[in-house]
Amino acid sequence: MNKTTRVMPAHKHIALVAHDNYKPELLRWVKENKDALQGHFLYATGTTGRILSKETGLAIKSLLSGPMGGDQQLGALISEGKIDMMIFFWDPLNAVPHDPDVKALLRIATVWNVPVAMNRASAKFMISAPQMEEEVSIEIPDYDAYLAERV
């Protein structure tokens, strides 16, 4: 597939997602990194967004709850180039009813080259990177070329 680039702005659009057993862990991480997150645009799936906003006071655009379509909404935003990175504390030891949606979300993040942190260590590296406050060019699929080849 042909590639092109897209520029992530200095003020990133960050998705925050956590499975039920990991919501307290994500909340703790967000509280620890509140200052770093304040200068960015935050999105979250429904329940997670409401908890994080209530407990931290951060402005967070809440989508639907993950099992009710929020994972798919987030995937659509990624496909549209509206999400720059994702912090997703998922539960590796328990299956969730919407596992296919979770897999689709992670697949679409990979397709569109969106950085994803899936635990505290990777989230710490991501939020601490100097690129968090800079414009960053990333390589993405050239969808126009893809369409031109297929029609």
Curated annotation (Swiss-Prot):
Substrate binds at H19, K23, T45, G46, T47, T48, S65, G66, H98. It catalyses: dihydroxyacetone phosphate = methylglyoxal + phosphate. GO terms for molecular function: methylglyoxal synthase activity. Keywords: Lyase. GO terms for cellular component: cytosol. It is an enzyme of class 4 (lyase). One of its GO terms (biological process) is methylglyoxal biosynthetic process. Its EC number is 4.2.3.3. It comes from the Bacteria. InterPro entries: Methylgl_synth, Methylglyoxal_synth_AS, MGS-like_dom, MGS-like_dom_sf. SMART domains: MGS (SM00851). The keyword Lyase applies. The active site is at D71 (proton donor/acceptor). SUPFAM superfamilies: Methylglyoxal synthase-like. Residues 6-151 form the MGS-like domain. Catalyzes the formation of methylglyoxal from dihydroxyacetone phosphate. Belongs to the methylglyoxal synthase family. This is Methylglyoxal synthase. It comes from Aliivibrio fischeri (strain ATCC 700601 / ES114).
